[in-house]
């Protein structure tokens, strides 16, 4: 199918369909969605969740306490927002059941650039997936999306409708709009003259989906929400005639759907008054002497915390506060999820194919999240950040607390302050374009750009110092460690084999040392007494600064003996035990004399050296670095290593 046929097919599928009232009622018998409220239809569009048993994944089990959590495919690109999405779905479920939430404003509260607008756009987009049914008369559709049920009286007609068509009583009770009341009068009470149109909600055409934004005190009045008289029609109709009214307000257009109020609490208070009755009673008054207008939809509002705090602290606004269902949308606090956000943003730009050195997105993610976290008590903020990503630090940081302990101490407002994703993405844009020749990103340029930007933003001194401390105290040393490993592993061709040899030798020496036995090397025949074994073990332990060798050796040997039982008597992989892996890596790379000629970009004295250097660069490029980045990062690493 070519693009033109595909487009036509889509256009035809979205066309309105007209029914008689009798046909509509017959449809109601088979299809609940014909009379479902806005929250029910939105739930249908969201679809069923994928249930994830976090007990099966160690990382998730630490974050979600082994709970079974729901993940919704409709929100799969909203990373790290499980709690907010679950609260939105909970609101919709309760509203769909006709509970108190049906009468409340769904209010997304969060910091700038935290994803509130994106969530609102997704909800509006989902609302387009399920059609609505609207009254029509003489070929004209109701301007306020009157549902056909507005024609029926709950007291008089509910029993018959329930008996004949299976329509529950609670779906009746929506008032008739002045437009529908006038047509009913013209038809002499004959409701069969009405038609019912199946319409697809549309953001573009503002059908059942509307958006309103705050203006200033002088130029915004309630007509933005409720509409006003259309002056052009006064030539033909009286001022209080329903046909003289322009139903252009957001509440008029959003009936049976969703109305988004952007930065709601920036609007003048007088503009918000119609929302009180629209939510609580399902109707509101227009600006002229016409009867009340119906509203049976969702009001979705969002704003930043500062506006909410100002509004909440004003005693005159108590009536509003009781009608608001708050969903907090904080910044993402998990490194792995923040990285996915950056990747998503990059994929929607020209930079999607630009080289990005390993560790760049991780480093920026760490910086952003450190800025959002509250300082913990008696623990490092860097450890807290790692715990928030689901890591277990019991072997590496004895002071680290559990995820829940950190959360409890931080309180409910954690993640509502700090650097936004927008700020981070602007930084990333500058990093990719830092080099005038090569469009690529690497952490060294990232450090430079971040330091510059912290100065330019003119943060309060204490905050700026805190951000610089994150850079110089945590991120730069950690990255130096990371790039050191990258360089060293690329340098050692038989890295894995060499590491395994040291591991096996260490375990053998430690085992004989613990048993206080001599050991004879089967390859060389050399005999090691307990003192010699201790000396050999210390050669491996000292570069890593092991403070209690006796306990460490016992711990390693016990681990290996247990592992052998499940591994056909063979030693486990040398990387399987984090503590010893770190010790071996430090031992392997403690001697840099051989390393320097290979990784430096100076002129080489022999073809052998040149070949080793070229092989090293090739292996680094296989890891995801460009040739230019290999040079930059090696030179930076050597400078940092020398200065430390």
UniProtKB/Swiss-Prot annotation:
It comes from the Bacteria. Signal peptide: none annotated. Changing residue 426 to A: Loss of activity. Cannot complement the deletion mutant. The keyword Zinc does not apply. Its EC number is 2.7.11.1. Keywords: Cytoplasm, Kinase, Stress response, Transferase. GO terms for biological process: cellular response to nitrogen starvation. Autokinase and casein kinase activities are enhanced in the presence of Mn(2+). Mg(2+) and Ca(2+) are 2- to 3-fold less efficient than Mn(2+) in stimulating the autokinase activity. PANTHER family: PROTEIN KINASE PRKA, PROTEIN PRKA. Kinase that plays a role in the adaptation to sustained nitrogen starvation. May act by indirectly repressing the transcription of the two toxin/antitoxin modules mqsR/mqsA and dinJ/yafQ, which positively impacts the expression of rpoS, the master regulator of the general bacterial stress response. In vitro, can phosphorylate the isocitrate lyase AceA only in the presence of malate, suggesting that it may play a role during glucose to malate shift. Displays autokinase and casein kinase activities in vitro. It can also phosphorylate specifically a 65 kDa unidentified cytoplasmic protein. Monomer. This is Serine/threonine kinase YeaG. It comes from Escherichia coli (strain K12). The gene is yeaG.
